[in-house]
């Protein structure tokens, strides 16, 4: 892959979420409690926007709370890093294992999180001579042709073509 075209897999995103705190969780540390509650529910998992990078969440603002019975509802605006690759996205990944069906690989970030697991099908690369020379733990370049994830998945699953050298 061409080094000048390399981009990270994460994008800074500004999102909002309704967060409920118990009356006992309200004090001088409201912001920390809101941040902790959001971190526990979304970091390291897939949400509708994509995979949320662990330890990237920062609360920017929050509403004055709305009292409901024994809890208080806040609307919280927060910033976090999201991974949501699109069709045609090129990325480097490490080969985890090779089967008759194809190559299973992972995209890892600097903290060893795995936002994307990739499958490179042998059928999609039957004319690529490089495919049979790839070994376990090799770093390969791929172009994503499709992906899927559901809420709370530990990573995004993608299918990809192998890029030539």
Where are these regions (language model features)?
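Single-stranded RNA-binding regions, centering on S1/OB-family and related RNA-binding modules
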Residues: 1-165
């Amino acid at each position: 892959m061409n080094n000048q075209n390399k981009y990270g897999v994460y994008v800074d995103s500004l999102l909002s979420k309704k967060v409920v705190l118990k009356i006992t969780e309200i004090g001088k540390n409201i912001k920390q409690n809101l941040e902790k509650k959001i971190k526990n529910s979304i970091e390291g998992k897939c949400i509708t926007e994509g995979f949320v990078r662990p330890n990237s969440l920062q609360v920017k603002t929050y509403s004055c709370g709305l009292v409901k019975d024994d809890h208080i509802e806040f609307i919280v605006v927060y910033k976090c890093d999201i991974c949501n690759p699109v069709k045609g996205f090129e990325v480097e990944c490490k080969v985890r294992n090779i089967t008759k069906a194809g190559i299973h690989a992972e995209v890892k970030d600097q903290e060893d999180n795995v936002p994307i697991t990739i499958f490179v099908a042998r059928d999609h690369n039957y004319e690529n001579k490089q495919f049979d020379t790839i070994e376990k733990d090799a770093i390969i370049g791929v172009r994503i042709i499709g992906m899927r994830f559901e809420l709370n998945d530990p990573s995004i699953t993608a299918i990809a073509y192998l890029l030539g050298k």
